[in-house]
């Protein structure tokens, strides 16, 4: 157990993931831009400094205590910014880590330009070594222990979420900090969604959850209660699928907690008076990755040769230079390859590991990227090539839509197979050489890969452009703003129409 002291309170962090993490946060408290790369000794406070802090604290009490009677009164000094903790939901992959550093430096520079004390800005992937911190709930006790007494608000943003600090100050001033607030741009389902386990099936629009791209905020009062609940209730979790929906459910707590409060200034579409903005759904890192550097593996079986395979051939197959269909039988008309692994009704772990072994063999061209999809996956290879330009194939990269399993109990993350699993050659080589393997041929391949990568320290890299389900299973507000890369399943839809409407570009850049 690690005991942290903040003000007059002691906060015990019993989770072993957080033991020994106090030193990095003394650095983060000072907003040292070099904190991601070095941790310095915490400065000592002089008597004058302590007296100054006491005076500031007294002023803040007066200000916030009278805020409800003077809502139009301008913010006093830099109190709001200095009491704001911004958590950038960064990732360990080098591309995403760099994006996180850049966002942090931009926020701190903007604060300096305002002539005010800066907020605390943290990179999520640096808070501890635990891979599951991306699900937010596991890290709330640590944030509360370190910043619970100094912060009034906690803002969670993505790497490409812009923060307009002076507008954000005005927005947060509207909400009394002693109360529990959960703020964001509201999304809702238009129909019962498999992604959300068909929650609120009688009226899916009745439950709101925040758009992660616009950012979402917790008041310190709510944050502290959630952290204490996580510490005391021995919470269990199985699958983490749609992060902000599940966080909203956790906060709402069957009506015992607050629902999301819609804040129009939390934006994804640029307009006047935005406190946050988000525009970079599909990054531009230069020319797309070459078609000749990607190998596509399609998993199929005999009963779908005449049903699903024709959809692949009529939609996205033409954008692949190297593509093979792997089945339980050989069919020269497609053609398919029999890897000698019996077909299974579920899981397909044996087939996937056989695909990876073939990818590293001399039987196929030596390229940097392996893309493994189901025969009912719809995918835009031109958009994928544009995204892959951002990643270094010399790194161990496992990319796709990230899910989690048992993350409140030191579980693991994985990329969902239906949305497509993208692996660098380096990642495949490290995985196979580790000796990690299927416990049975019908084990869930995507989950086994995630467990294996977690065990050898390879991070799972998330992109919201991959989708395990169909377009209608996601919020229309968000999905229409994306340049999606994939969808999954042919149930009750015209898959060709889905591909045409959601994934096909009028002028794909296919010359490379």
Predicted regions span which residues?
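Secretory-pathway lumenal glyco-enzymes, predominantly type II signal-anchor Golgi glycosyltransferases
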Residues: 2-512
């Amino acid at each position: 157990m690690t005991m942290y002291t903040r003000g007059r309170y002691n906060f015990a962090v019993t989770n072993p993931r957080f033991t020994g993490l106090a030193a990095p946060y003394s650095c983060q408290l000072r907003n040292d831009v070099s904190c991601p790369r070095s941790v310095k000794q915490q400065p000592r406070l002089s008597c004058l400094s302590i007296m100054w802090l006491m005076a500031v604290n007294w002023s803040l009490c007066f200000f916030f205590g009278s805020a409800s009677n003077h809502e139009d009164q301008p913010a006093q000094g830099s109190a709001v910014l200095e009491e704001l903790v911004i958590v950038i939901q960064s990732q360990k992959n080098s591309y995403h880590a760099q994006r996180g550093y850049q966002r942090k430096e931009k926020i701190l520079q903007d604060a300096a330009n305002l002539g005010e004390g800066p907020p605390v800005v943290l990179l999520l992937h640096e808070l501890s070594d635990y891979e599951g911190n991306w699900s937010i709930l596991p890290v709330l006790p640590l944030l509360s222990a370190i910043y619970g007494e100094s912060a009034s608000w906690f803002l969670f943003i993505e790497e490409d979420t812009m923060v307009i600090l002076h507008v954000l100050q005005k927005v947060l001033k509207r909400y009394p900090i002693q109360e529990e607030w959960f703020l964001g741009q509201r999304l809702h389902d238009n129909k019962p969604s498999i992604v959300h386990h068909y929650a609120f099936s009688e009226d899916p629009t009745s439950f709101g959850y925040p758009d992660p791209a616009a950012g979402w905020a917790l008041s310190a009062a709510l944050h502290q209660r959630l952290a204490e609940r996580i510490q005391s209730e021995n919470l269990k979790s199985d699958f983490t699928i749609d992060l902000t929906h599940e966080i909203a459910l956790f906060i709402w707590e069957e009506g015992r907690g607050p629902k999301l409060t819609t804040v129009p200034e939390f934006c994804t579409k640029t307009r006047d008076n935005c406190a946050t903005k988000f525009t970079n759904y599909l990054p531009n890192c230069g020319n797309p990755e070459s078609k000749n550097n990607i190998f596509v593996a399609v998993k199929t079986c005999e009963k779908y040769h005449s049903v699903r395979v024709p959809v692949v051939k009529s939609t996205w197959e033409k954008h692949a230079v190297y593509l093979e269909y792997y089945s339980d039988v050989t069919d020269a008309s497609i053609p398919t390859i029999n890897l000698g692994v019996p077909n299974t009704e579920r899981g397909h772990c044996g087939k996937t590991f056989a695909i990876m072994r073939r990818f590293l063999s001399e039987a196929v061209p030596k390229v940097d990227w392996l893309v493994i999809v189901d025969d009912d996956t719809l995918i835009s290879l031109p958009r994928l090539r544009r995204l892959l330009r951002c990643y270094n194939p010399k790194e161990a990269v496992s990319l796709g839509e990230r899910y989690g399993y048992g993350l409140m109990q030191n579980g693991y993350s994985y990329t969902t197979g239906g949305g497509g699993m993208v692996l660098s050659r380096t990642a495949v080589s490290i995985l196979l050489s580790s000796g990690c393997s299927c416990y049975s041929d019908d084990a869930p391949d995507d989950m086994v890969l995630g467990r294996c990568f977690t065990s050898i320290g390879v991070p799972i890299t998330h992109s919201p452009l991959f989708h395990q389900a169909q377009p209608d299973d996601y919020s229309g507000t968000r999905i229409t703003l994306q340049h999606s890369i994939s969808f999954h399943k042919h149930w009750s839809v015209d898959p060709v129409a889905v591909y045409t409407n959601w994934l096909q570009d009028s002028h794909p850049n296919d010359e490379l």
